[in-house]
């Protein structure tokens, strides 16, 4: 069995530790060169959790501390000549989660203390904003060089309570106070870098820093974090080959599997494909493809929001949106779309420059399967053993193209769903239908547009395309007739596959499928 060529820094986010210990590092220092050449002073970057933000922040810290030896052989080594040593204040707020006001104040106190030990503290500096301002000014005075402030995961203290107004207000006031000196400290600052997941406009960062560059949606920074397809197929190719060998695949087959599981992120209109770095590195190191990112912890705030806004997973694929509908503050949102995008559960799939319209979708199989697993208890039987038994029989029927048997399995299973989990809308049954088929890893799309309407679901099999129409308390014949009347089959006539239309009737009283009609087109 082929050996792993690269030594991967699994769980390590400190640049100096990676470089000093010979761990594999994908050079991202060209982006620091770009910052310096453009004389950028305040930069904000939004990316999902575990996507490399902290490593990039650590890289910036090492650069501004003038640690030239760590950058030998990297892009910035050819650019930087002076390697000035600036005082760097690096605040990591990722640990400030699930806190009340007292705990958050204590956390900020512990973050400030090391710098006060280094640069001193004056009487009267009591509140975090006063202490931060004093530290920066003294650091500048004592070293003769402007300070650098790095704030990693600036929004972490607020995300878990974003849906709880009473709890959010006191925490937001504390963080607003902490960040408030940044604007007036401009004469003492060389650079300020802030990372997070979403935007809280009232935290003074966005409302007061007029020269803040939010690079989150810029094409040139789309791969500032994460791993691009080019980086995988060049620097990491030997280990992808080794993974393929371990899994009994060719390199091309392994690359396809890695792409399906971990690729698909796009952070701008013309973004290159970006792989989830956490999952990709874990997979190459462990020689196993698994849901590492999703399995590392779905944020509780996300599940609460999915519940609050009654998210229909079926509607997330192919969601059309203008920029302001997903690039907005979580405090201003009226649905879950902004947070789903900013948290990495949706990504940009397509951009129409004429209408400035984005098409959003779930990035890859890891995220899709993870969302399905998280949401299915809200729609079907919470008992995992019952779900597994049903899915096994259902799966076998679908894969042998026996839709009759598959729907019979579904009818029996749906009758067991607890009544209190249900509502009786057509959307609800459509979502259950979508969840069932999606678990089989079949390519299924819901509400697919035709020239004069939308099919409820389209399922692509190797030799057959199924078009489904679902009706609640109406006949299966009516559902079948709508497929013909609306021309739902027309887009697929040129594909050379067998075309089958399926009309399904749900009985809201019996809480299951009452009838279906299957007809080849």
Question: What is the role of each PLM region?
Answer:
Residues 168-173, 472-489:
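Mg2+/Mn2+-dependent nuclease catalytic core
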Residues 433, 455-472, 486:
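Conserved catalytic cores of phosphodiester-cleaving nucleases, focusing on short active-site segments
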Residues 491, 495-521:
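Domain-level recognition of nuclease-like catalytic cores that cleave nucleotide substrates
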Residues 1-425, 440:
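Phosphate-binding site recognition
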Residues 148, 464-466, 500:
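Structural motif
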Residues 451-455, 497:
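Short beta-strand or tight-loop elements
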Residues 436-450:
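A short acidic/basic microdomain associated with nuclease active sites
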């Amino acid at each position: 069995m082929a050996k792993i060529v690269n030594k991967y820094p699994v769980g390590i986010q400190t640049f100096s530790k990676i470089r000093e210990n010979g761990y594999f590092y994908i050079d991202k220092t060209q982006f620091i060169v770009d910052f310096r050449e453009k004389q950028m002073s305040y930069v904000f970057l939004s990316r999902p959790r575990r996507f490399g933000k902290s490593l990039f922040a650590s890289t910036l810290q090492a650069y501004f501390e003038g640690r030239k030896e760590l950058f030998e052989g990297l892009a910035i080594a050819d650019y930087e000549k002076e390697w000035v040593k600036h005082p760097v204040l690096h605040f990591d707020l990722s640990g400030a989660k699930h806190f009340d006001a007292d705990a958050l104040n204590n956390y900020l106190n512990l973050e400030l203390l090391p710098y006060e030990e280094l640069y001193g503290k004056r009487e009267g500096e009591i509140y975090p904003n006063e202490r931060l301002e004093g530290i920066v000014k003294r650091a500048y005075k004592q070293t003769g060089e402007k300070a650098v402030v790095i704030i990693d995961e600036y929004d972490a203290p607020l995300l878990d309570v974003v849906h709880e107004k009473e709890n959010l207000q006191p925490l937001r006031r504390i963080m607003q106070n902490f960040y408030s000196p940044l604007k007036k400290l401009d004469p003492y600052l060389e650079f300020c870098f802030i990372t997070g997941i979403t935007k809280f406009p009232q935290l003074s960062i966005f409302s007061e820093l007029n020269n803040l560059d939010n690079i989150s949606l810029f094409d040139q920074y789309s791969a500032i974090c994460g791993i691009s397809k080019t980086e995988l197929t060049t620097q990491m190719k030997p280990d992808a080959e080794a993974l393929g060998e371990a899994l009994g695949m060719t390199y091309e087959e392994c690359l396809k599997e890695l792409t399906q599981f971990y690729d698909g992120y796009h952070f701008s209109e013309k973004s290159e494909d970006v792989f989830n770095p956490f999952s990709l590195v874990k997979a190459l190191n462990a020689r196993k493809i698994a849901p590492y990112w999703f399995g590392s912890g779905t944020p509780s705030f996300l599940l609460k929001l999915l519940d609050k806004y009654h998210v229909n997973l079926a509607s997330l694929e192919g969601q059309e949106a203008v920029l302001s509908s997903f690039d907005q503050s979580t405090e201003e949102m009226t649905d879950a779309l902004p947070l789903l995008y900013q948290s990495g559960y949706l990504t940009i799939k397509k951009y129409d420059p004429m209408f400035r319209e984005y098409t959003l979708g779930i990035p890859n199989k890891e995220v899709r399967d993870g969302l399905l697993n998280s949401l299915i208890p809200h729609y079907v039987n919470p008992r995992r053993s019952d779900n597994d038994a049903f899915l096994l029989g259902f799966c076998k029927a679908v894969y042998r193209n026996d839709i009759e048997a598959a729907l019979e399995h579904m009818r029996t299973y749906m009758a067991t769903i607890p009544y209190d989990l249900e509502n009786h809308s057509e959307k609800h049954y459509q979502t259950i239908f979508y969840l069932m088929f999606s678990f089989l890893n079949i390519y299924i799309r819901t509400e697919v547009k035709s020239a004069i309407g939308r099919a409820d679901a389209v399922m692509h099999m190797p030799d057959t395309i199924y078009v489904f129409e679902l009706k609640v308390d109406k006949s299966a014949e009516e559902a079948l007739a709508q497929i013909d009347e609306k021309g739902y089959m027309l887009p697929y006539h040129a594909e050379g596959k067998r075309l089958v239309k399926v009309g399904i009737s749900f009985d809201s009283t019996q809480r299951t499928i009452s009838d279906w009609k299957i007809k080849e087109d």
